[in-house]
Amino acid sequence: MTIKDARTPASTQNTAQADTAENTDTAEDTEAGKSIGWHKAYVEGSRPDLRVPVRQVHLTNGQSVTLYDTSGPYTDPLVDTDVRRGLAPLRENWIIARGDTEEYAGRPVRPEDDGIKHTSPRGGLRNLDAVFPGRPRQPRRGRDGNAVTQLAYARRGEITPEMEYVAVRENVSPEVVREEIAAGRAVLPANINHPEIEPMIIGKRFLVKVNANIGNSAVTSSIEEEVDKMTWATRWGADTVMDLSTGRNIHTTREWVLRNSPVPIGTVPLYQALEKVDGRAEELTWEIYKDTVIEQAEQGVDYMTVHAGVRLPYVPLTANRKTGIVSRGGSIMAAWCLAHHKESFLYENFEELCEILAAYDVTYSLGDGLRPGSIADANDEAQFAELRTLGELNRIAKRCSVQTMIEGPGHVPMHKIKENIDLQQEICDEAPFYTLGPLTTDVAPAYDHITSGIGAAMIAWWGTAMLCYVTPKEHLGLPNRDDVKTGVITYKIAAHAADLAKGHPGAQEWDDALSDARFEFRWEDQFNLALDPDTAREFHDETLPAEPAKTAHFCSMCGPKFCSMKISQSITEQFGGTAAAGATAEEVAAGMLQKSKEFAESGNRVYLPLAD
């Protein structure tokens, strides 16, 4: 496989959008609004339409570092993106070529899909038209009741273009990808009605993934803001995005997000179903829920959180909890079960739901509706009773060829985290675990991205496949654009730390490149290799804003006389490589004295030019 530069002709799927693009030496980061030291490139697979995007960071020493990229076409200078048009359908030809799907008319969009009763006007669509104006499309589904899932293909021994795509992204063989999906240890969320996505995989043998939540509420936000949050989250590394909208215009918001998203989109159908009955949980029915799932599957939702593990017998187990049931979906289903004193309609109709999801390749994210909402409630009987049911449902889903991952807590102190992953892997046959944190303490509102980032790094090291981010606004309010970035960066740190601990191929190459740049005082390389180049550069320039500071052999932390790396570098230059390890104290002192003289003889020059 070869890497091709985005500064050469763009990929075939993007050429239609490249009308006004210009060739440039460095990609313009349109989201951050700054020109930075990397560009979009593509790794070619076995076929001309399989080109996997990567981020190539150019170093001042002439080398480059290739990094995983989730930002989609928005950072390709050859692609003219427009949210009103949406992204090009990257996977469309792959889906059609398989010959096992068909287009059909689909269900009509109804006013209640957007939380609107009959003819009441739509509101809150600032600066964007109500209906997505992009290319007309009809939904697809499996022909003749076929399961058109990546799991079904993998079990038949087929390596799909999507599987090869993620193999390139993960630096593994396509057969490894197929094996992990076939065994149910990994999922490749890719609804056939979301052809715009760049395929990715979730499983413990692969890079740890990060999900970012967006979504409006009855109190705040608009469609425009949610689309912006989605593109902003993927710019900083979100591997998937969940639209958790609970206010007006739920259907319309989701359509705009899906048509513009290069990453898989997840939802909780129960939220929209509840809006259709004016928020009265007791009025929910299987028919309303089923219709909502079909509506979302036709739009292209890639994975759905389904709280089918919240059963009537488990509700009393939460009575003595400190914080009760904190999951929105869990509380809705618990209220329904108690109102009717019946078993959950999600649990009782689970196999029929599997048939629907298999027809569109929607992945299950089996929800943890009884997760602990405080560390006092961690690892209690209610939580683990639900987990045992999720294991049962996972086996049913796999029998129906539906890809499945399992959601996990929540609030768990550090000494109880490992029990969660060990039990989940045992009970759920190693299905991918997808956890919210967990938060390791409850005392830090406004800093829960940190309390949860600690738990996230630990549980990912032990095998969690995807982490749901937590922002500083957790428990306090709806996150804004800055909160989204902070949450994503925090969780990318946790995920990468886990990748290092697991020994994922290529993970340490990134760290080594930044360490070399730090030791050699290549400041621009340090900035450009950082997870957040903008903030790294900003912090450096707060105290050393002058351009010559970018070549200084110190920073404002220690100054020119006390920089440990400069001193270490001087020792290495004096004695060279391995010889320095055997230097005596007298030799080190002599070397330091010699360097002091050289510094004085050079006119006490602090700033040195970069090497050619």
Swiss-Prot record:
Transmembrane segments: none annotated. It catalyses: 5-amino-1-(5-phospho-beta-D-ribosyl)imidazole + S-adenosyl-L-methionine = 4-amino-2-methyl-5-(phosphooxymethyl)pyrimidine + CO + 5'-deoxyadenosine + formate + L-methionine + 3 H(+). Pathway: Cofactor biosynthesis; thiamine diphosphate biosynthesis. Substrate binds at N213, M242, Y271, H307, S327, R328, G329, D368, G369, L370, R371, E407, Y434. It comes from the Bacteria. InterPro entries: ThiC, ThiC-associated_dom, ThiC/Bza_core_dom, ThiC/BzaA/B. One of its GO terms (biological process) is thiamine biosynthetic process. Residues 1-33, 105-146 are annotated as: Disordered. Binds 1 [4Fe-4S] cluster per subunit. The cluster is coordinated with 3 cysteines and an exchangeable S-adenosyl-L-methionine. Its EC number is 4.1.99.17. Zn(2+) binds at H411, H475. Residues 12-24 have a biased composition (Low complexity). The keyword Zinc applies. [4Fe-4S] cluster binds at C555, C558, C563. GO terms for molecular function: 4 iron, 4 sulfur cluster binding; carbon-carbon lyase activity; zinc ion binding. Disulfide bonds: none annotated. Keywords: 4Fe-4S, Iron, Iron-sulfur, Lyase, Metal-binding, S-adenosyl-L-methionine, Thiamine biosynthesis, Zinc. It is an enzyme of class 4 (lyase). GO terms for cellular component: cytosol. Residues 105-117 have a biased composition (Basic and acidic residues). It holds the Pfam family ThiC_Rad_SAM. Its cofactor is [4Fe-4S] cluster. Belongs to the ThiC family. Catalyzes the synthesis of the hydroxymethylpyrimidine phosphate (HMP-P) moiety of thiamine from aminoimidazole ribotide (AIR) in a radical S-adenosyl-L-methionine (SAM)-dependent reaction. HAMAP family: ThiC. This is Phosphomethylpyrimidine synthase. The gene is thiC.
